[in-house]
């Protein structure tokens, strides 16, 4: 049975998940290839294109791309780049669209490269050095992309050598595990991980985990999770009164046990008393790409391309303003329009406001003519999400304070599900396609983007009205 790098990484995260994919593909719950993953894949190919340009600029270098290595035990690797140096050495290059060598739980580039090296060597190709090619996070585009400045070549030979023995053992364990004909279906290793790191097959291997569960507790530490697992505690209803939780986690448990929202009326009033009319409910949509799209921007640097603004006056009057950039350009026109529409008075109400505030700080540096305006917005910004972390907690939010979780509970008549654009990743994708489209296709995408961003701020208005009436 074939084991690729992608397979191996999946094995390290959840062996049973990979076994099911390989041995019972019809049973495996193949998820949708999300817009986010599609974008990552496209960007990976784009970075590889600039790596090719870098090497092709020096005709003396002998570099092959996508060289395949296979072993009779099932290992399969396609090397991003392989170089034969004049002194007879072979250098393996692993190409990534990140701005650093990552070694976290979600992405371990050293494991990726080590797998490729081991596969090549077991197939008979000696590897003398290993480099990880990633983007230079400090690169600022000016005109045509300069591959030599865009790319960073990190020599990870020694770091890969340090984990070679461990990785080789894991590869052999993976091959042996996949060869097993029977699989114990009860539980998988993802039980010990946070919800965001659960495998696609978590529900199949753990069908009795209730909703909400201990995985709904916000920011639950690994230590606390292990304590609950040691007692086979999954249901929030079963958490003992003496179990130590953070105040926010305790509220989620209390709301679940009460079967009703936990609402701190005085806390809500205290929070909202700091809001000043007119209330400017505000949301950005941004664009970012691995290879910078615009001059004066850097890899993965976000810049606003759209905003929606609902202005609620003290007498209840509601106005809506919006702007969508229709071409690839810095947001100077966007900010000029926003400055006309957002007055010098009143609170700026956002949800997860740190995102908007971070963009404002970055854009104040990039476009100093708007610095005073953008920093003033930051000074006036309040975060409506904060209220749903401490003052209004409902078990139906599933431990989250995301507007995508709060809105269906408080305002079920408003829904993202009917929209063509339903989240930030698809908005980014739609904007990229819109600026390269013409005529009706561009207008359809523009309309979808405007509808999505408008709902973001309208949702905040309606949620505010509900909590303000408590």
Question: Which role does the model predict for each range below?
Answer:
Residues 7, 26, 37, 150-276, ...:
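Cys/His-rich finger/ribbon microdomains and the adjacent scaffold used
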Residues 95-104:
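Short beta-strand-loop-alpha-helix junction that forms the active-site gateway
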Residues 145-211, 231, 406-470:
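Acidic, Mg2+-coordinating catalytic module of metal-dependent nucleases/exonucleases
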